[in-house]
Each structure stands twice: as C-alpha cells, then as structure tokens.
From Swiss-Prot:
InterPro entries: DNA_pack_N, P-loop_NTPase. This is Large terminase protein homolog UL15b. The PsHV-1 may encode two large terminase protein homologs UL15a and UL15b. The terminase function was assigned to UL15a since it shares a stronger sequence homology with the other family members. GO terms for biological process: chromosome organization. Belongs to the herpesviridae large terminase family. It holds the Pfam family DNA_pack_N.
Length: 450
C-alpha cells in the first residue's frame, strides 16, 4: 500500500541529491570550499516510522531530515535505507536495507547483485587455482593452458554511464542510533553470504567451475580414444596442433579457446545446477543461482524460468559424431573428482560402446590425481577417493536389448549405482540425460544425489 508513496519519496530524494551535487560542482568550479553535506551513506526518511504505520501518507511526505551530527560514525556497507516497518524492508547487499516496494529497488538490486557476484566469480576462480596446488599443474599440463589464462579478467558488465551515475550518488547519513538496527540486518544478510562462500561445499563448486574452464581453453585436449566425432582430431595431426599449440611469439598468434554447442552448454548447466543443489544447503539456493548466473552469463533468466529449467527433463536428439562423448568424458571426470558423494551412471546399447569411455575416464583421473586415488572394480565401476576419505563413483552399464524402455534402463543403472528411485510420486533424486541418435539406440547419463 505504500509502494507509490515510497516511489514518490525516493524520486524527491534523488532530485534533492541531484541539486546538491550540482551546487557542489558549481562551488568547486568557483574555487569555494567543498560542501559540508555528509558524503557517506545512509538514507532518507527519519521520523516517518509511526506515520507510515498509521498509513498517513501526507505526514510521510514531509519526513526528509538530514543527520544533524557534523561527523557521524561511518557505517561500512550502507548506501540506502528507508525508515519503515521491518516487514516492508528488504536488505540488498552491498546496498543495505530499503523498502521492498520501492520503485528503485530493482535498479539497486541489479547493480548490487552484478557487482557482488561478478567479483565473487573472479575471486572464487583465483581461490580455486591456489587451492588446487600440485593438482593444478597436472591439469594445466593436460589442458595446455598457462597460469594466466585460467581466470582472465572479466569485462565490465555495466554501461559506463550507469556505473558513473552510481558512483556519483551520495546519500544522507543516519545517526549512530538509527543506523544500528539497519546495520544488524545488513550484517545478518552478509553473514549468510559469507558462510556460503567459506563452506567446503562452495569450494567444491568453484573448483569444478575452474577446472572445466581450464580444460575448455584448449578444447579438452587429452580426450583421446573415445567419442571420435566431428570434434575429434588425433593428437599428432597438424590441425590439432594449430588449434591448441600455436606459438604466441610468431605473428602474434594465440591459441583458440574451445567452444561449446548449445546442447553441450545445456548439459553442463543441468549437471552444474544439480550438483550444486545437492551439495549446498537449501538456504544457499538463491545465492547459488545468482553465482551460476554470472558463471554461465545468464543474468536475464527469471526465477520461474530457472526453476522450470532445473526441474524439466531434457532429451537431446544429436547426430552421430557431433561431440557427445567428446564432451561427456571430461564432464564426468570433473564431476566425480570435484563433488563428494556423487554417483554417476553411464549406459550404452553395447558393452563395447562403454568400454572406451570407461578407459578414457580412468586414464584421465589417474593422470590428474595418481593411481592411488582412483580404483576400478570389475571393469564396470570407477571409484574416486578424496583426501578426507569421501568417495564418488561412476557405474557403466549396457543393454543388449535395444527395445528396452527408458524406465527399465534407468532402474538397471540405478540398481548398479545403489541409488533408489521414488516411483510413487516421481520425486527427482537423480538427474538423467537422454541422447538419441538417428538410427542408433538410446544412451543416457544418470547423476544421483548422495
């Protein structure tokens, strides 16, 4: 009910700030002293709490007052707040608390989210690079990427004019007593954010993102012996060498980065969102979605669209030799070596079709981490051991009967992977990818929660 009044108040407040900024620029141009208006942060309405609770919009319109103290205590992190009932407030880091119905809240939320999570992506990739340590050297040698190519600087996602306008905003400051309540709310929100990024589960997610980006730099170099599709070129061929091992000192040539097809990016997004959902707790779901939106460059995905994307089943009709196995081998290898307790099932119509995939994944994991942490059981299961004793596994299965139903095939892999399926209500504790090739039987990949 106060949305329109709050929008009017915010508009009047912005106009007053614009006038003061113009006066300050004019005074600076004339050589006079700088304005004594407090330049630190804070908000806008004081003394309007009771009026807004009673619904007296007319009294609230006259509620503008600047802080009277000449040198108030700086409150770190605050940029905006509205003095209204707590149930009407929304805290947006690193902006602060504002009215949830404020017309400008969308602008603040977008700008703050972009700044916060864009920085988080860069910092998390750098932290993952430092954490990997010796394992990073094996990964870098396998991918052919140098140290500086792992996490290149991201371009600024904001327009220059918008960033300049945000930098020029200066808000009135709260007194110490008024700022304490908003500061507690802000600290509570940021505490949840800090707990997420400091958790071991988020470290697993950031490690996976970093490692996949490193391998994508050179089109998954080293994925030989399996999936010899359109993207496969033998390691000794000149074409492969020109693509990934160009000499940067000669004619300014730089190696070309790998590119994903649309269906490959969708598979990657499905697998990453699923692994993040089963790894992080429910309280971190919204923050995790924002983080992955920055990683996959999908900032315009709405919440309903993202929820539908995570819940739906995807069937990919992909022709032969178009990069299915070329992409799945490094994806499975990274999933099983980054996320603890994950169980993966891979099936094909014939055993000879799963054997090269099994051998390549096993060889890749041994090359990255050594044979002590990788174990194969009866030629159909690969178990990966983490340093803390946790395990993840991959189960390979085949079906000679090409007319077998999807449900029967799913039960077969689930039984070997020892993961249950709730048939009564269709609860999704597994994520399955179905791949159909023209004139070929069905293949699919199954990911199961711990």
């Amino acid at each position: 009910m106060f949305g329109r009044e709050s929008a009017d108040l915010a508009k009047k407040y912005f106009e007053s700030l614009r006038k003061k900024a113009a006066d300050k620029r004019f005074a600076r141009y004339e050589g006079s002293a700088a304005s004594e208006t407090p330049s630190a942060t804070g908000p806008l309405l004081r003394g309007g709490h009771e009026e807004l609770n009673r619904g007296c919009a007319n009294a609230a319109r006259d509620g503008f007052e600047l802080a009277a103290q000449p040198e108030p205590r700086r409150v770190t992190g605050f940029q905006f707040a509205v003095d209204v009932s707590q149930r009407f407030q929304a805290c947006i880091p690193p902006v602060g608390s504002l009215h949830s119905c404020c017309a400008a809240s969308c602008m603040f939320a977008f700008a703050a989210s972009e700044a916060l999570y864009e920085t988080l992506v860069a910092d998390s990739l750098e932290a993952a690079r430092l954490k990997v340590g010796a394992e990073y050297k094996n990964l870098a040698n396998d991918s052919g990427a140098s140290d500086g190519e792992m996490a290149p600087p991201r371009p600024d996602s904001m327009l220059g004019g918008l960033r300049g306008a945000l930098d020029e905003l200066a808000f009135a400051q709260y007194s110490n007593a008024d700022a304490e309540a908003h500061e507690r709310v802000y600290d509570g929100v940021m505490a949840g954010y800090s707990d997420m990024i400091c958790s071991d589960e988020f470290a697993q997610l950031s490690d996976f993102v970093f490692r996949f980006a490193a391998l994508l730099k050179t089109s998954f170099k080293g994925t030989t012996g399996a999936g010899r599709g359109a993207y496969y070129v033998s390691p000794g061929s000149n074409k492969r060498r020109r693509l990934n091992r160009g000499n940067s000192s000669r004619n300014g040539y730089r190696p070309r980065e790998g590119r994903l097809e649309l269906f490959q990016k969708m598979i990657l997004m499905h697998a990453t969102y699923f692994a993040a959902c089963i790894t992080l707790d429910d309280e971190s779901t919204e923050r995790m979605d924002r983080y992955l939106a920055e990683v996959f460059n999908t900032p315009l995905f709405s919440s309903p669209a993202l929820h539908h994307f995570k819940q739906r089943t995807s069937v990919f009709l992909v022709p032969r030799r178009h990069g299915k196995t070329w992409f799945l081998v490094p994806l499975i290898s990274l999933l099983v070596s980054c996320f603890e307790g994950l169980r993966i099932g891979y099936t094909a119509h014939l055993r000879k079709a799963t054997k090269p995939v099994f051998e390549e994944i096993y060889a890749r994991l041994c090359r990255w981490y050594g044979e002590d942490r990788v174990h194969q059981i009866k030629g159909e299961t690969i178990a990966f051991s983490f340093k803390n004793g946790a395990r993840s596994s991959i189960v390979f299965a085949s079906s000679q009967n090409t007319n077998v139903s999807i449900r029967q095939l799913l039960y077969g892999v689930a039984a070997k992977a020892r993961c249950g399926i709730d048939d009564a209500n269709g609860r999704v504790s597994e994520l399955a990818f179905y791949f159909c090739s023209h004139g070929a039987p069905l293949n699919f990949l199954l990911l199961s929660a711990p």
